[in-house]
UniProtKB/Swiss-Prot annotation:
Cofactor(s) of this protein: Cu cation; Zn(2+)
Main location per the UniProt record: cytoplasm
Stated name of the protein: Superoxide dismutase [Cu-Zn] 2
Family: Belongs to the Cu-Zn superoxide dismutase family.
Binding residues for Cu cation: 45, 47, 62, 119
Species classification: Eukaryota, Viridiplantae, Streptophyta, Embryophyta, Tracheophyta
Free-text comment on the cofactor: Binds 1 copper ion per subunit. Binds 1 zinc ion per subunit.
Keyword Secreted belongs to the record: no
A Gene Ontology term for the protein's cellular component: cytoplasm
Length: 152
């Protein structure tokens, strides 16, 4: 089994730990807890780069090895890194489990070394009608990020 982890921090006080697990060539399960967010939906994506030299702004666009448009996790036409939204409760904390087939921990499209990013606003999943809907999900600013590393 492949395992990965990302520790999220930000200057805005958002913190979290995200775990990734993949059995063989199967789907990857993402589990995590993120705190310090405003209640509601927040876009959640794997970004192309593991570069945090300028915080989350240097993590590049959504991970998109197949050159597709932005979409929902269940859409056939979507970025590999489009993981939808996490739901934050009234206490400012999100606890979640996501299973996805496009974010492997090994091989040419591995997400290891890339960044996971939490956004300020909901991801409209490519269906919002805004010009950014098909590129970023119009999910607003980047409020926290962490680099996905291998876990022993």
């Amino acid at each position: 089994m492949g395992k990965g982890v990302a520790v999220l921090n930000s200057s805005e006080g958002v913190k979290g730990t995200i775990f990734f697990a993949q059995e063989g060539e199967g789907k990857t399960t993402v589990t995590g807890t993120v705190s310090g967010l405003k209640p509601g939906l927040h876009g959640f994506h794997v970004h192309a780069l593991g570069d945090t030299t300028n915080g989350s702004m240097s993590t590049g666009p959504h991970f998109n090895p197949d050159g597709k448009q932005h979409g929902a996790p269940e859409d056939a036409n979507r970025h590999a890194g489009d993981l939808g939204n996490i739901i934050v409760g009234d206490d400012g904390t999100a606890t979640f489990t996501i299973t996805d087939c496009q974010i492997p921990l090994s091989g040419p499209n591995s997400i290891v070394g890339r960044a996971v990013v939490v956004h300020a606003d909901p991801d409209v999943l490519g269906k919002g009608g805004h010009e950014l809907s098909l590129t970023t999900g119009n999910a607003g600013g980047r409020v926290a990020c962490g680099i996905i590393g291998l876990q022993g």
